[in-house]
């Protein structure tokens, strides 16, 4: 199973800046990318085509959208469809990121609709789940992960697993705060996610990649990736510079 190393560039970088960073990243790892690594870059929408173009000859790299709407087309101002993402060179899309849930107010049901529609349209999905500090302190970790995972995958058929889906566990309290869940917390959460995936998909759930996404940096990436049931990382701030993210990819 290849480790999935994903970069979420959020609302940063112009199209030109994103293209330059992607090209630099590919150059830094051109001769050193291990066979057990797969890299996905999630730039903002206007940078999708430039980044895809910069990576078109980069082995092991692909591009994804940060969001999607569950419709092929229509009167949905400001939205983007799976087909439009693929037209820009995307193979992946993020659904359920904590900033979409907590800043934009997306419901579990909308996340599930986006996930299923995207997979049916031909995209692969990184479904993000995770708890707030209030939920963790209230002892609701298992409840929250089960709800988000069950609703997020409600429309996903078993034959789509594991190739078309990955799950990113992102403790909300550790995103952009500089706080990092310790190894025991990461292992606990990822074990719960694995149990839920196996309960939902049987043997297929064993092979679904589970990523960790909470303030991953070059300094802690190797330790995190070595933990049980950690099959990659979803990186925010530390992925914005090619040198930093290349060190994480090669950790």
Swiss-Prot record:
Q: Keyword Cytoplasm, does the record have it?
A: yes
Q: Which SUPFAM superfamilies match?
A: Triosephosphate isomerase (TIM)
Recorded metabolic or biological pathway in which this protein acts? Carbohydrate biosynthesis; gluconeogenesis; Carbohydrate degradation; glycolysis; D-glyceraldehyde 3-phosphate from glycerone phosphate: step 1/1
User: What Pfam families does this protein's entry cite?
Assistant: TIM
**Enzyme Commission no:** 5.3.1.1
- At the top level, the lineage of the source is Bacteria
Q: Where in the cell is it found?
A: Cytoplasm
Q: Which GO terms describe its cellular component?
A: cytosol
Give the stretches traversing the membrane.
Answer: none
Query: What catalytic reaction does the record list?
Result: D-glyceraldehyde 3-phosphate = dihydroxyacetone phosphate
Enzyme category, top tier:
isomerase
Gene3D superfamilies given for it?
A: Aldolase class I (3.20.20.70)
Which annotated residues bind substrate?
8-10, 176, 215, 236-237
Q: What is this protein called?
A: Triosephosphate isomerase
Task: Give the organism, scientific name.
Answer: Nitratidesulfovibrio vulgaris (strain DSM 19637 / Miyazaki F) (Desulfovibrio vulgaris)
Q: Which gene encodes it?
A: tpiA
């Amino acid at each position: 199973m290849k480790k999935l190393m994903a970069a979420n560039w959020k609302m940063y970088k112009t199209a030109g800046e994103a293209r330059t960073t992607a090209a630099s990243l590919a150059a830094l790892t051109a001769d050193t990318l291990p066979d057990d690594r797969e890299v996905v870059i999630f730039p903002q929408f206007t940078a999708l085509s430039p980044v895809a173009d910069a990576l078109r000859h980069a082995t092991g790299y692909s591009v994804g959208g940060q969001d999607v709407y569950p419709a092929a087309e229509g009167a949905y101002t400001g939205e983007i469809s799976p087909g439009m993402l693929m037209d820009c060179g995307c193979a992946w899309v993020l659904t359920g990121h904590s900033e979409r849930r907590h800043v934009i107010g997306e419901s579990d049901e909308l996340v599930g609709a986006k996930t299923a529609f995207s997979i049916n349209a031909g995209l692969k999905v990184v479904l993000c789940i995770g708890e707030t500090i209030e939920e963790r302190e209230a002892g609701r970790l298992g409840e929250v992960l089960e709800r988000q995972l069950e609703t997020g995958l409600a429309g996903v058929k078993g034959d789509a697993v594991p190739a078309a889906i990955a799950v990113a566990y992102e403790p909300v309290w550790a995103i952009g705060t500089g706080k990092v869940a310790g190894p025991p917390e990461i292992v606990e959460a990822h074990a719960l996610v694995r149990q839920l995936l196996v309960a939902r998909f049987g043997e297929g759930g064993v092979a679904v990649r589970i990523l960790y996404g909470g303030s991953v940096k070059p300094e802690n990436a190797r330790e995190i990736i070595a933990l049980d049931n950690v099959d990659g990382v979803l990186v925010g701030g530390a992925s914005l510079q090619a040198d930093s993210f290349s060190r994480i990819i090669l950790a």
